[in-house]
Amino acid sequence: MELVEIREGLARVLVPKAERIYDAPVFYNPVMALNRDISVLAVKALSPRRVLDALSATGIRGLRYSLETSAEEVWMNDINEDAFRLILKNLELNFGSKPVLANGRAELGLPEKRLVVNLGDANKLMSENFRYFDFIDLDPFGSPVEFLDSALRSVRRRGFLGLTATDTGVLCGAYRRACRRKYLAEPIRGELCHEAGLRILIGTIVRYAAKYDLGVEVLLAYYRDHYFRVFLRLRSGAKKADESVELLGYLWQDETGKFKYERDFLPGKRGAYGPMWLGPLKNQAFLEELVRLTKTSEESISHRKTFQFLSLLVEELDVPFHYDTHALARKNGLEVVKISRVIETLHSLGFEATRTHFSPTSIKTNAPFDVVLRSMRK
């Protein structure tokens, strides 16, 4: 395996040299640098003591947690032997010492940190460490669903989860049967698919967590490029679980682009999409702390758009779903107008309205559908 050295954040990382990332014997995706930037900022903000990077590949995520955060104990795991050996090389490259190896596990003891690298199945590792970790990061190829039960048992009752889902085609309705099978939910196609897909993912996590009398607080959830990313704080107790379940519900949309959603355990009429999460997609204080950290932790920002993206999320109105102005124009026989003009008109009418990260042609607003259409006619 031919290797090249790259730098991301404070980490120096050996990664496989390959024409295409999917051809490499150990997976490394440079596009996910922004994902890793935000994850490092999140761990900095939350200050967990024990962190698990359950699906490590090159180890770049776990290495950055080790180098850039205050976590006292960082575990990295992969089932691939090539990945395991590569993580050991990367540990030595960054810390100057060889980890002690025994029985498929390596450990590196530093003055203020304990670093552990495990060779094995992620579900097995999490099952063997019941309520041990304060923060578990799941960054799989595809869906995180197969790891949810183990992660929810392995994380502490008031711990944190960071999850990535790259099966956007499934969650966005291109593979409807797969979404029903994996997420037990009906997906929607069209301009709302990315937000609805993200909310289906969160809704699934809520249902899994509720089995263990765990509630869910969404600290941050977003869509970007080819993936969804969610940061959650778990809340212990049946009452907290019930409160989270009560924020699940369904979405309807007609041919004009008008949508309706309602929080309920069962859909009130036919044609529903879901179940899905209808609660907040961000904790404003948490998100503002991430933005603050980008200004004081420049070494942790490797992607040029991290600050810009987080700033957009801070300003975004946190209401369910959005209106795509191009789709509304097409469906209602209107001319496309500038988003800035629509937002200004809605503000002048006394409504809130912002851009959204889900689409460059969409707005989030608390204005009724008819008012949004009128604002596009002026």
Swiss-Prot record:
Enzyme Commission numbers on file: 2.1.1.216
Protein's GO biological process: tRNA N2-guanine methylation
SUPFAM superfamilies: S-adenosyl-L-methionine-dependent methyltransferases
Keyword Methyltransferase: yes
Family membership: Belongs to the class I-like SAM-binding methyltransferase superfamily. Trm1 family.
Function of the protein: Dimethylates a single guanine residue at position 26 of a number of tRNAs using S-adenosyl-L-methionine as donor of the methyl groups.
Name of the featured protein: tRNA (guanine(26)-N(2))-dimethyltransferase
Organism field: Thermococcus gammatolerans (strain DSM 15229 / JCM 11827 / EJ3)
Gene that this sequence comes from: trm1
